[in-house]
């Protein structure tokens, strides 16, 4: 189905660990079909959880192993400051703003450390209300042009969408 018109990415949920060697097959498919990989990520403290959960370090390792694959580390409010720092040196690794409840200053921190082109809106629907997920960006202390990039420009660029 990846060859179908309009197919833009691969979403990997909580059932896998991004550091697992089998992820090379996902990277190969993403490369072959020019797809973005969105990896569910969450900071974990219990090592047993990491079998089926990707900690920010796991997602960063996946990005480091496959520098030619565009990867989104999902759930900024689940990966927190540590996730941003894990992504900082990896230009192919982006973060989305979905996840838990808004945390004051976190979006600004991500933009400061990753730049305005590597942070993008994430809704995590139906778990979060759109008013909350959009509001965390609209309420951030950022210039309007940066907010536009976060809300749609960066995603459009990553997914090769044409904006009219």
Predicted feature descriptions by range:
Residues 49-56, 81-90, 104-113, 129-139:
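Histidine/acidic-residue-rich catalytic or RNA/ligand-binding cores of hydrolases
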Residues 1-6, 25-33, 61-66, 85-90, ...:
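Acidic (Asp/Glu)-rich catalytic clusters
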Residues 77, 98-109, 148-162:
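C-terminal helical cap
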Residues 1-45:
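Active-site gating/metal-coordination segments in enzymes
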Residues 8-12, 37-39, 71-74, 93-97, ...:
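Hydrophobic faces of well-ordered beta-strands that scaffold small-molecule active sites
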Residues 1, 30, 75, 95, ...:
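Conserved, mostly hydrophobic/aromatic
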Residues 75, 114-131:
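Short acidic/histidine-rich active-site segments
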Residues 116-118, 131-164:
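Mid-to-C-terminal alpha-helical segments outside catalytic/metal-binding sites
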């Amino acid at each position: 189905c990846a060859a179908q018109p309009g197919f833009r990415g691969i979403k990997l949920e909580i059932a896998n660990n991004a550091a697992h060697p089998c992820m090379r097959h996902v990277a190969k498919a993403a490369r072959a079909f020019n797809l973005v990989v969105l990896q569910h990520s969450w900071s974990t403290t219990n090592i047993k959880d990491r079998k089926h959960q990707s900690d920010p370090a796991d997602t960063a390792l996946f990005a480091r192993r496959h520098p030619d694959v565009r990867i989104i580390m999902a759930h900024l409010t689940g990966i927190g400051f540590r996730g941003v720092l894990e992504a900082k040196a990896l230009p192919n690794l982006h973060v989305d703003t979905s996840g838990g409840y808004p945390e004051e200053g976190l979006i600004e921190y991500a933009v400061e450390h990753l730049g305005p082109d590597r942070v993008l809106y994430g809704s995590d629907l139906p778990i979060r209300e759109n008013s909350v997920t959009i509001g965390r960006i609209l309420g951030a202390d950022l210039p309007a042009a940066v907010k536009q990039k976060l809300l749609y420009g960066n995603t459009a660029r990553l997914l090769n969408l044409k904006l009219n």
